[in-house]
Amino acid sequence: TNAFFSEAKLYTMDSYYVKTKDEIKKTLDELKEDVANGNLDPYNYGTDDDGNYVYDIYEDIETWEQEYETAPEKKTLTEAKPVAGNYFSCIAQMPDDSQYYYMISSDGSDTLSVKIKKAANKGGEKIPEDAMWCDYGYSEEEEKPTEESIGLSLDEAKKLVKEKVEKMGITDLQFSNWNYAVCKSFEGDNSSGNFGNGYRIDYARTINGVPVTQTIADGGALEDMDSTMETWSYESLCFYVDKDGIESMTYSNPYTIGNIKTENLNLLSFSEIMKIYEKMMVVTNADNMQYENSRVYNIDRIVLGYARIYEPSTDAHTGILIPVWD
């Protein structure tokens, strides 16, 4: 909390987002104007298989009219106080009127999850609720971000993140990877809109200079719906950064490092590793559909890292880290 919001005021979500009578009346007036103009699908949700509108504007109007009856004339903000070990969510309002969602939780396979996401820019300009940061996907539909379009260099972004990590008191995770990132939201017509470019910066636990391998999966998934095993979510620390600073942060499931199981472990030679990879790459992709046969895989880096080995049938709360080539 102090690392990000030492100067912020924290308010409960319910008190911050409650709709006043004036706000609800504005929404009702807009919906009723749509009806008067014959626009029964103002959000372009379309129709179902029977030709009926997916969005029922009349039902929505009725719901807002009911909300209006009990809505307050003005908001009364309630201060929020984080409590360790319990679910907590709030809005953090900064001195420059920018705002952040702030959530702490512990549930299921997540021993700890801390999430921060900007909700409003400086001056209080709201960011669409469905806006989310994601990695640049090298899609032909997306223009690749550049340092110029972001307005911030990678080194500057790394420095901002490093300062926050130090304030968080995290010393056993280090910078491991980065990628360009884009912030997207769906417009009123359900088309995707770009709300900015930035960087994704990841930190990973590093032991004697070797990082724990970062994976696309977050862990915590069952092998199948009938599985009864306890799942294990992975440790991660991820930031999205743009010219205005930290836009989003997720910190999950910190590990506790135990004892060394085997001293001086020997790895296969690199040439042997490459032969195994070349063989297994073909085997693991053998059942791909015909059009996948033309896919080309470009390997731009090979890294020594720790792989997580987890045996829930033996112990659902500990695992082993083994050095592997990625």
Can you say where each PLM-predicted feature lies in the sequence?
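Preferential activation on post-signal-peptide N-terminal prodomains/segments
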Residues: 1-226
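A short, compositionally biased
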Residues: 84, 321-323
